């Protein structure tokens, strides 16, 4: 009896090819895994603080953000980060009274609905195309430097989870979260990754030297760059959690928390929108969509659709916030951090998403006991490299005018702690400089031609 095989339909073949492309490594596996943890310097402190202060459901947050990582890794084919909405988190824990989980969810859903509306109507794509590049670079520079400043404070001072800020007491030199540990992690990452150059760029530089010397240096640099430095440092931090507090083993409970839909009252919507969503919306538009699209073009030579990124942020939060998950967005700082430590494909964040799912399903809310003992100095080191990588995206501002706009925008953003304020000043400055160099002769010629045409029309005989 003959057996026949049915070939794949064209649509099935194209879908399989699309999935294979999305699941293809663009860097060695060790580098992709190292890059996957490159943005945890911001993720862990904010999640830990919201869990301890605002009673955030950690298990639900890990499960939903794990699904987000997997979905965005497949959708965008780059290490698209999933990070907390920082302005909402800051308001939730630093202002009195603290926001409740329902109010945090209302703020996240309000921000998400705004970004979804901007993306669906095409307004986000319009903004992306008309905003001057020096202004975007100014926002990126200010965000990167703010990350770096915060990272240095994490390394130098003890961390206060009640305020989401470093405390005034300096960090001790010795100990399992001391300065020596943080400095050792810093030196290890610098020696293994250098300034963050790609291998191709390093090979091009070495090609100009003598052949024997360049070959030995190339082998040494390839060996160093193959070390998953961020992954090793993060794994060391996890081990130190159990050494610092062995009672963690007794407090761990297996299984996720029960899913439930939050009850959000009208007062929760009002408080969440007025106190947290209003300052978050401009930051999400600038840093989570526009800056991410610009940075992806710089790092991966891939132009992302501002519409797709905006809708992605909207859909994620309109689903997860109703179950108590932390409001999240895509951040340029997280993208820069993951790229800095070796992530080049969407498979990197897929690995991260799988890890979050496993932790959320196995340990649930008890995982906060582990996070509470994680050395903050190590997180500061990871955050420092992410901030520097984001700030270095502004290196393409070659003209003095572009650099002037960028620096003014960054200075205002950092002084007022508001990316929206710096963005507004940058746009006004850009328009003033363009108005200053506007060719007035064209305006004069146009006015003269209009006057002459008016005289000719008056002199022409009218038909009776």
UniProtKB/Swiss-Prot annotation:
Record's bilayer topology term: Multi-pass membrane protein
TM region(s), chain numbering: 33-53, 62-82, 116-136, 172-192, 223-243, 309-329, 348-368, 374-394, 404-424
Keywords of the record: Membrane, Molybdenum, Transmembrane, Transmembrane helix, Transport, Vacuole
GO biological-process terms attached to the record: molybdate ion export from vacuole; molybdate ion transport
Tissue: Expressed in leaves. Not detected in roots, shoots and seeds.
Localisation: Vacuole membrane
Signal peptide: none
Effect of a null allele: No visible phenotype and no effect on molybdate content in shoots when grown in soil, but increased levels in leaves and decreased levels in seeds.
Record-stated family: Belongs to the SLC26A/SulP transporter (TC 2.A.53) family.
More details: About 80% of the leaf molybdate is exported during senescence.
Function: Molybdate transporter required for vacuolar molybdate export during senescence.
Protein name, as recorded: Molybdate transporter 2
Annotated organism of origin: Arabidopsis thaliana (Mouse-ear cress)
